[in-house]
Amino acid sequence: MRHRKAGRKFNLTSSHRAALYRNLAAALVEHEIIKTTLPKAKEIRRYVEPLITLSKEDSVAGRRLAFARLRNREAVTKLFNDLGPRFKTRPGGYTRILKCGFRAGDASPMAYVELVDRT
């Protein structure tokens, strides 16, 4: 039974799912807004918010933990040099999900995920 099991599977293997989260998170950090399906948007929020909290305090250990999750040097640099200081006083809730209709091909619900204080 699946009772109290958090997270979505997306019919993917665990390694494919981890790569999906890593790539979406790196894209969100880099571009500060991305368009994806609504379920993926809700999952990526669970993945990115702890990374931003980690980046509020710049340390080598924190950078290594973030790199282990993202595997993208540019994203980690932006996370700690730009996003961490920007969200220093905000106690969570760094992302916003905006629904934006349905995809033409398969009618999947689509959404924008953006960082709240986007420049």
UniProtKB/Swiss-Prot annotation:
Alphabetized GO MF terms: structural constituent of ribosome
SUPFAM superfamilies recorded: Prokaryotic ribosomal protein L17 (SSF64263)
UniProt-listed Pfam families: Ribosomal_L17
InterPro entries reported for this sequence: Ribosomal_bL17, Ribosomal_bL17_CS, Ribosomal_bL17_sf
Family that this chain belongs to: Belongs to the bacterial ribosomal protein bL17 family.
Subunit (UniProt): Part of the 50S ribosomal subunit. Contacts protein L32.
Protein name: Large ribosomal subunit protein bL17
Protein's organism: Methylococcus capsulatus (strain ATCC 33009 / NCIMB 11132 / Bath)
Phylogenetic classification of the source organism: Bacteria, Pseudomonadati, Pseudomonadota, Gammaproteobacteria, Methylococcales
